[in-house]
Amino acid sequence: MWYSAHAICYFSYFGQDSFLVHENVYLVEAGGEDQAMLIAKQVAAEHEDLSEDGHLEVNGNKAQYRFAGIRKLIEVELDSETGIGKLHSGVETTYSVLEVDDFSEVERLAAGEMTSVLYRE
């Protein structure tokens, strides 16, 4: 089975007053949900950057890139009706549920522009 693993990672540096957070989505193949979670944690942890040599900076501050955890794990629904039964173009691999205050925010979100959202999951 295939899973989409939503990993939360963040930048850490001395004296910060807010956190820049990334949600990285990894495609994981596993025999079940427990195994997928273990693999997802391993994959995400391998992307940490804990070096202190200064090559990674946030707002001029030496930073580290840290893995916080797996926020959600979603089983990818393969298209059984077509008989394909495998990953192919057009398969939905993940989703998110968001809420905004008005339609102009829907349009900004769809255009990739910054807007405020309420994450519903």
Protein language model annotation of sequence segments:
Residues 15-19:
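Short consensus segments that form the blades of beta-propeller domains
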